[in-house]
Amino acid sequence: MTRIRRGYIARRRRTKIRLFTSSFRGAHSRLTRTMIQQKIKALFSAYRDRDRHKRNFRCLWVTRINAAIRENGVSYSYSTLINNLYKRQLLLNRKILAQLAILNRNCLYLISNDMIK
């Protein structure tokens, strides 16, 4: 039996992977086996960190709102503000409240003082 060279198909597959890993450092962008492993690892990390990204931002928003409210009054906290917002049916999500805490504190103070009364 004669030997068949798998040139075209294998080369096309490897160049596709090489294009993906071209920005990686060291052997991760040069050696085929490590390129494949690093591509799998990169795609897995991207998938995992999409949810982690959302989680981190929500945590940041909660922290910003809580810090801004506690500056205003000592006996008032984030959880009571959110609870009162739901009771009054004010549709302000955490992202908007965090932006108010940074850009327009007076507006946030007005909202939180309205909730206390």
Curated annotation (Swiss-Prot):
Q: Its family?
A: Belongs to the bacterial ribosomal protein bL20 family.
Q: Give compartment(s).
A: Plastid, Chloroplast
Q: Which organism is it from?
A: Populus trichocarpa (Western balsam poplar)
Fetch the Gene3D superfamilies from UniProt.
6.10.160.10, Ribosomal protein L20
Q: Spell out the InterPro entries in the cross-references.
A: Ribosomal_bL20, RIBOSOMAL_L20_CS, Ribosomal_protein_bL20_C
Top-down, what is the taxonomic lineage of the species of origin? Eukaryota, Viridiplantae, Streptophyta, Embryophyta, Tracheophyta
What HAMAP family does the entry give?
Answer: Ribosomal_bL20
- UniProt GO MF annotations: rRNA binding; structural constituent of ribosome
Keywords recorded for this protein, A-Z: Chloroplast, Plastid, Ribonucleoprotein, Ribosomal protein, RNA-binding, rRNA-binding
Record-level GO BP terms? ribosomal large subunit assembly; translation
Write out the coiled-coil annotation as residue ranges: none
Q: Which GO terms describe its cellular component?
A: chloroplast; ribonucleoprotein complex; ribosome
Q: Under what name is this protein listed?
A: Large ribosomal subunit protein bL20c
Q: What does this protein do?
A: Binds directly to 23S ribosomal RNA and is necessary for the in vitro assembly process of the 50S ribosomal subunit. It is not involved in the protein synthesizing functions of that subunit.
